[in-house]
């Protein structure tokens, strides 16, 4: 065991002395020492209850014969960080989380690891650490928030963002907005739709790194506590059998994750995080693979913001195992992949009985014949760009319109709110990429403003930044290379005609080849003048097309 490095032999007497200072005894030092990485926080609604989840994990570890120790990581609430300079730190925090978990585990020689995340960047950050460390590990997340209710209508955080635009459009009053904001988020948990946090929690389950139910059991249900206890017990089995993340997170497991990603219509951020996790596992998850799988896998669950259902609705009809079972009927899932249950995917989903086809449509009758995400390429995005096609209006799947170019989110939001954007326009936001932002901010505020004004099916938006999972509309992000790295998005000018063809997977600016080359040769990219962590991040971060990992 790794912990024997700090517990065994006379030379380790000083180490044992410090462990005794924790209240541990001789018997506890003979057992596997399990690190519990908790991202409990009083500023993140999705993490407010993780102290209770971590304690339940601790109980499970004890009951199975292990010695649990809890340690902490940081986290950022993307919703609170949205729309201001704080969002520059969100994606960048993913790397800090991965590094911090690695640091604590290696420094203290744990035998196994239970990861307790919940929200957007914490889940992938912890999975990156698990892949990097490659010791027995299991994830148990905090679970989704329940949907709110206002005047008999279910709602969630994305409704609040869009309501801001509705106030500006005169559709609702500020008093109504206040009522909506107080009703949308009724308690702890990750925001209730198929946004980034829930997307990643569901895909963690698909990858095999979490027990069935991890993605959909609501945060406030007692079943979530039982899942945490069970996860604590299961890590001891994984340690005893030496089942490691490298045994579970194989290329085929990632293909399963992308398959379910497409079926659910998950956040575009999955196209950043899955490649980043795979990178830590020594695997290359190219963007083209997302398109290859999307062409084969239909979109069978329409959850908010694309549809009307919430994660709790998916939970009630069997959750992720039921989705995988439905997909397996058409041989779209690799069933022989090992999971943290100790069983294969096939064994896990064999327990699924009746599937409610109101929430989970049959593969033969999907919402869309192709998956939820699409990767677009062209002269604007030779390295690729990503759109949640499941949340794009039919009228915007093919669009041609004049560019309205803005350097940074704030300029674009001001123009949208002040009525300077017309039907048919293509809003282009530059210098928001991983390096140019830096930090690749989410553009939820401008897309929500467009939706609130009733323009989400009339105006497109493209950017080298990214989008919240709560975004809907013709929002194309992750344009690579980014402007700060000399990408062609940086040469687009006001009035240029932008051609978007999502079915054809293309994104282009309609200018002559000679004009294109002239602009590129005269292009001098701007780099951010920033110090501190973001300054270091900007120097080392890779392209969005490779997961925005640090090089």
Curated annotation (Swiss-Prot):
Keywords: 2Fe-2S, Amino-acid biosynthesis, Branched-chain amino acid biosynthesis, Iron, Iron-sulfur, Lyase, Magnesium, Metal-binding. Its cofactor is [2Fe-2S] cluster; Mg(2+). Binds 1 [2Fe-2S] cluster per subunit. This cluster acts as a Lewis acid cofactor. GO terms for cellular component: cytosol. It comes from the Bacteria. Its EC number is 4.2.1.9. Pfam families: ILV_EDD_C, ILVD_EDD_N. Mg(2+) binds at residues 78, 120-121, 442. It is an enzyme of class 4 (lyase). Belongs to the IlvD/Edd family. Functions in the biosynthesis of branched-chain amino acids. Catalyzes the dehydration of (2R,3R)-2,3-dihydroxy-3-methylpentanoate (2,3-dihydroxy-3-methylvalerate) into 2-oxo-3-methylpentanoate (2-oxo-3-methylvalerate) and of (2R)-2,3-dihydroxy-3-methylbutanoate (2,3-dihydroxyisovalerate) into 2-oxo-3-methylbutanoate (2-oxoisovalerate), the penultimate precursor to L-isoleucine and L-valine, respectively. Homodimer. This is Dihydroxy-acid dehydratase.
